[in-house]
Amino acid sequence: MSSGGLLLLLGLLTLWAELTPVSGQDRPVKPGLCPPRPQKPPCVKECKNDWSCRGEQKCCRYGCIYECRDPIFVK
């Protein structure tokens, strides 16, 4: 294989490796439940899914509000 073809293959593999985790659709949701709705202006969108939040936080939906919140756990 020529060096140009090898570089192209390496570039495509790198791009594929970078784009694969972005989907996040196959990942299970994080444990815990979202706490009660906060008092905030309507339609604030801080996150898209649990994996766009830091650490153990979950992406919680309250109507059109999406925000990262610490989970609560119910026994």
UniProtKB/Swiss-Prot annotation:
Free-text tissue specificity from the UniProt record: Expressed by the venom gland.
Alphabetically ordered keywords of this record: Antibiotic, Antimicrobial, Disulfide bond, Secreted, Signal
GO MF annotation, one: serine-type endopeptidase inhibitor activity
GO biological process, any: antibacterial humoral response
Pfam families: WAP
SS bonds (residue pairs): C34-C60, C43-C64, C47-C59, C53-C68
Major site of localization recorded for this protein: secreted
Signal peptide (UniProt feature, chain positions): 1-24
Keyword Transferase: no
Compartments, record wording: Secreted
Residue span(s) of domain WAP: 27-72
SMART domains for this protein: WAP
GO CC field: extracellular region; extracellular space
Functional description taken from the UniProt entry: Damages membranes of susceptible bacteria. Has no hemolytic activity. Not toxic to mice. Does not inhibit the proteinases elastase and cathepsin G.
Protein family: Belongs to the venom waprin family.
Record's protein name: Nigwaprin-a
Species: Cryptophis nigrescens
Classification of source organism: Eukaryota, Metazoa, Chordata, Craniata, Vertebrata
